[in-house]
């Protein structure tokens, strides 16, 4: 693909990707803290609140997996318009729910579209951004997670508190539909024809797409790395709030400030690491962020050090985000142009499944003491550090393999040009 033809649209696409991901992620994340509002307004059983977020996550993973082989067969712009309209339209429709069953159904349906939409969106970003700028630009798009935690979650709570529980759904749903109009206006047309010349036909059978990817050791290695990272990460993430309050006696009212500090620090470290990746320091970036992250986990949650929770949590969030965005930029080099949307969708599926399994496994492992404290968190912290180190070692194995493949492809293209 000739990236220069899309160069004038790069900034528009990257900015739109950030905003779309922020709204999409935020609308998924907001339902857990809105649980008490659902209980009072819809008479929802407290134990069913977890099914809303969990159901949407697994639905996104399943549909993302099933849809992946088809995603590269369509014009990226047209696919995005359809998928995002469904995604945010269903989110807005949640405001009409009159029972917990209706809300569960509508929100899970919205989650079904989230996986394929994210895959196509990220593939479009990778298509447009030159390879030597991907670290910085993907780190910029990766800030959407931090912004969702900093902006969308507090705003959703405030809207629900001041208006009603429906307000976050129609606010962010309609906001997402406005972004669809911006996609229609500012996004370049990206037909599959321009990708076919670099790989296979855009009409390749879905089964062939899956078989082609599964036959690639790089693809399997990339999915394994992402799965290990997300599994280790979500051994801890779902239980932080309870652990901080019940084990560390951290004030409930200060939890939001804690996440604000972590989110702001994450935005800084992601941009820093993105710049380092573009300068060719991929291996060093992964090693430094992972080793520091493992040290923070062990010193903050395992070893008997009396460190400030603000320091520990801020470093944890900042290093986790930097490592994740760096890994995403590295693995973005795995698929060929005609495989990108499928790969991104499969990668999202792997991440969702791994995080879901980790959440369930960690919840089953932890127990509550007679004093109301959580037992077993330090063991989970050790396991999280081990998974982080394992993912680091595999990433260090992936980087030279990608470089070697790039050299071979460049040599092959040079030979073909010479022959002509």
Model regions: which residues?
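Extracytoplasmic gate region of multi-pass secondary transporters
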Residues: 32, 219-259
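Conserved MFS/SLC helix-loop-helix module at the cytosolic interface between two early adjacent transmembrane helices
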Residues: 62-98
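Cytoplasmic helix-loop-helix junction between adjacent transmembrane helices
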Residues: 108-144
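A membrane-interface helix-boundary motif in multi-pass transporters
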Residues: 161-173, 366-388
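C-terminal transmembrane helical hairpin of 12-TM major facilitator-type secondary transporters
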Residues: 283-327
